[in-house]
Design a protein with these regions (language model features):
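Extracellular glycan-recognition regions
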Residues: 23-214
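Bacterial N-terminal signal peptides that target proteins for export
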Residues: 1-10
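Bacterial N-terminal signal peptides
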Residues: 9-18
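Sequence signature of WD/YWTD-type beta-propeller architectures
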Residues: 210-498
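Short secondary-structure capping/junction motifs at helix and strand boundaries
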Residues: 4, 92, 322-324
Length: 498
């Protein structure tokens, strides 16, 4: 049998509450949130243990939401999972059923949701602060049989299940700081304020807290993602469990991404799919400092397969082949290729000092460009070939610097309260992306709270913008990862789960 939930109307910022009654199921209340023209509803079928939610509203997007929500309050770590279906034909492919966690019941509240759209699109959506715009991470899978939204500490993530019914990480997570208590529940938005749509949620499971097995080692989830510079809406391309992947390069034709894992290089279609190993001959301990020549014909690697296990730079054909040694001296870590394809830039340790060097792409005598005390690292060329951007801790904190390609004219670019690493100019010369750690983090370790930030190279007065906040660091964007049209960036994010 079915039981209606207590309903009340919540307009843009005004709350009107009808008499509260005891409710069945796991939720306590139900309401339309935001500017909703037609009232929605939520009912619970105790026999089938299912929830049917109808909702209107224009969207759950931008700076405010309009939908029907049924909820309970919780604190701490929490998960909510359900099978979601649309029993009737929807009038808009963007109508969606969601599993949702919200800070408040106001329309512009911070929130995160796992959204299944009527057309099968599946995504993790979020608003970081009150009144901010909504962002999303699209899963590289459609029409999953089950979704799970998980809040663990200050990170939120999505898992989905296919035909097997087994939930697996959908890839990508983001930082969302909520105070206790928060609201958790189910929602429906019709994406058309003149109609209501219906979704059924079955096998709803809500858990509070995570209890890992005694002595259990956290599992590593690596996700290769892309993000458009214009929308900032991320897309998970490829996800692995218990296998570290690092440092994607975008091929010049825009069709593939190259990354490293367990000492090997792999090529992956930019749309996702099965990765293919690239033959690197005897070089089977490739690290995360690799790239592709401007003409797309050659790959450069930094490999540690020699008996001394020190990194040296090699080149090989893009389709794979026998590596050619470029730097005899070690350790050497590649980071940049000149736009004309003739010169490689890299970080190397010589006589106890890490500095920036260049060498002809075919091998030869290396040229030292920096000699400041401390670490100079991460060199990458500007697309016009006039400058090399790099990071240096010569002033105390790690910051982005720039110099001419002969090493002269060294100038500091960033001067903020972060440690900034691995600057990469966009191919069109308009943007500089780099990785930022908190100022108290030493080095560029893995598994830290980091931000990808963008600095305009055409507006000298503009402050860096946050492109994405994630759990990452070492391996996220060590090397150039711009799409050839400068519209997107590839990177790797990580999760550690019990």
């Amino acid at each position: 049998m079915k039981f209606p939930f207590t309903r009340f109307s919540l307009s843009w910022l005004i709350l009107t509450l009808s008499p509260v009654q005891a409710e069945p199921g796991v939720f306590t209340s139900s309401a339309d949130l935001g500017s909703v023209k037609l009232p929605g509803s939520a009912t619970y079928n105790a026999t089938e243990e299912s929830y049917t939610v109808t909702g209107g509203g224009t969207n759950m997007w931008a700076t405010a939401d309009a939908f029907h929500f049924t909820w309970k309050q919780m604190s701490g770590d929490a998960t909510i999972a359900a099978d979601i279906s649309f029993p009737e034909a929807t009038r808009d492919p963007h109508a969606k059923g969601v599993l949702i966690i919200r800070q408040s019941l106001y329309a512009d509240s911070p929130y995160a949701d796992a959204a299944l759209h009527a057309d099968g699109l599946t995504s993790l959506q979020y608003r970081e602060t009150k009144g901010d715009r909504t962002y999303e991470i699209q899963a590289n899978s459609t029409k999953p049989s089950r979704l799970r939204l998980e809040k663990r500490g200050k990170y939120v993530s999505l898992s989905i299940a296919g035909e097997s019914g087994d939930l697996e990480p959908a890839g990508g997570s983001f930082r969302l700081v909520l105070t206790d208590p928060f609201y958790i529940g189910l929602g429906v938005c019709s994406h058309n304020n003149d109609v209501v749509e219906k979704a059924v949620f079955r096998k709803v499971e809500i858990t509070n807290g995570t209890t890992p097995a005694t002595g259990a080692k956290p599992r590593l989830i690596s996700t290769l993602e892309t993000v458009p510079i214009a929308s900032r809406d991320r897309r998970a391309i490829f996800t692995t469990i218990d296998q570290l992947i690092e440092a994607p390069n975008w091929t010049p034709d825009g069709q593939s991404l190259i990354y490293n894992s367990k000492g090997r290089l792999y090529r992956l279609p930019v749309t996702g799919g099965a990765p293919a190993v690239i033959d690197t001959g005897s070089a089977i301990r490739c690290n995360n400092d690799h790239g592709i020549s401007p003409d797309g014909k050659t790959i450069v690697i930094s490999d540690q397969s020699t008996p001394d296990r020190k990194s040296r730079i090699y080149t090989l054909p893009a389709e794979g082949g026998v590596p050619q040694l470029i730097t005899e001296a070690a350790p050497s870590y590649w980071h940049g290729w000149s736009p004309d394809g003739k010169t490689l830039a890299y970080c190397a340790e010589r006589n106890g000092e890490y500095d920036i060097y260049t060498v002809p792409a075919t091998g030869g005598t290396e040229l030292r460009l920096t000699d400041a005390k401390g670490l100079d690292d991460g060199p990458d060329y500007s697309p016009d070939g006039q400058f090399i951007y790099f990071n240096s801790d010569r002033t105390g904190n790690m910051h982005v610097w720039r110099m001419k390609t002969d090493g002269t004219g060294q100038e500091q670019i960033t001067k903020d309260g972060f440690n900034n690493w691995f600057p990469h100019p966009s191919p069109d010369g308009k943007w500089l992306v780099f990785l930022s750690y908190d100022k108290d983090v030493k080095g560029h370790p893995e598994n830290k709270d980091v931000s990808l930030r963008l600095l305009s190279l055409t507006d000298s007065g503009k402050e860096p913008e946050v492109l994405a906040k994630l759990f990452g660091g070492q391996g996220t964007i060590n090397v150039p990862s711009w799409s050839p049209d400068s519209k997107k960036l590839a990177f790797v994010s990580y999760q550690l789960v019990p």
